[in-house]
UniProtKB/Swiss-Prot annotation:
This is Large ribosomal subunit protein bL20. It comes from Clostridium beijerinckii (strain ATCC 51743 / NCIMB 8052) (Clostridium acetobutylicum). Keywords: Ribonucleoprotein, Ribosomal protein, RNA-binding, rRNA-binding. Pfam families: Ribosomal_L20. InterPro entries: Ribosomal_bL20, RIBOSOMAL_L20_CS, Ribosomal_protein_bL20_C. GO terms for molecular function: rRNA binding; structural constituent of ribosome. The gene is rplT. One of its GO terms (cellular component) is ribosome. One of its GO terms (biological process) is ribosomal large subunit assembly. Belongs to the bacterial ribosomal protein bL20 family.
Length: 119
């Protein structure tokens, strides 16, 4: 039985990793071992970053809504509770966009929430 040397496969894998490491500084773009470590770390960080982006945007939307509701003398949590009681089903992204681009409409939403809280 012939010995399998895997030269073709390892060359293909090395080229793939070095292609992904293109633009890295120094040996990280030229040496397979360090390039592989850098690529693995970069791919892991990009995966984590995609998950964190969702959290970051939600936090941003909440901060914007909170700022807009406090201008109208209401806290964020009470506003969200009032909106829920009123049966208005708008997500936080849309609420933050309304707060920025159409303050009058947002003030009307705050008034609806206040009425529901007092009722």
């Amino acid at each position: 039985m012939a010995r399998v040397k895997r030269a073709k496969n390892s060359r293909k894998n090395h080229k793939k990793v070095l292609k992904l490491a293109k633009g890295y500084y120094g040996g990280k773009s030229k040496l397979y071992k360090t390039a592989n470590e850098s690529v693995i770390r970069a791919l892991r960080n990009s995966y984590v970053g995609r998950k964190n982006k969702k959290r970051d945007y939600r936090s941003l939307w909440i901060a914007r809504i909170n700022a807009a509701t406090r201008i109208n003398n209401l806290s964020y949590s009470k506003f969200m509770n009032g909106i829920k009681l009123a049966g208005i089903d708008i997500n936080r992204k849309m609420l933050s966009e309304i707060a920025i681009n159409d303050p009058k409409a947002f003030t009307e939403l705050v008034e609806v929430a206040k009425k529901q809280l007092n009722a």
